């Protein structure tokens, strides 16, 4: 429930996403560790840190007006995005090897989704509309992974996350269109 309220807050650009996200990620880290999904466990630790950063970033004001609005990626940010994705792929690979868990196709898939979610959260904290595309892709890959690992309820939760991410993209697209016409 906390993760769902956090995702719904993202859709509507509300800062409630951050406190609910902090609690939800802490609980989910424990669950993911027990199911040997180390990449997803680490990504939730990253979500925790990025939630603190995003809370600060989203709440910044100048003269009682929020200064960080929804925007698109700029060309210079694509390099950062690629480096973040590659860095997370390499880091999570080494975590799996260190714990001797790089032994199943699920480790490969978990590594890929972790990289996708690292990028999605970074973009979300920066209020970039492209974050929703990464959330949608990552969620769609995670649904069958969690179902296969026996995390049926979490799999269903990611179906809901996918719907919320689609709604988030639509909502933020409307905001962008509105701000570009003013």
Regions found by a protein language model. Give the residues of each.
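Hydrophobic core of alpha-helical transmembrane segments in multi-pass integral membrane proteins
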Residues: 5, 78-96, 162-165
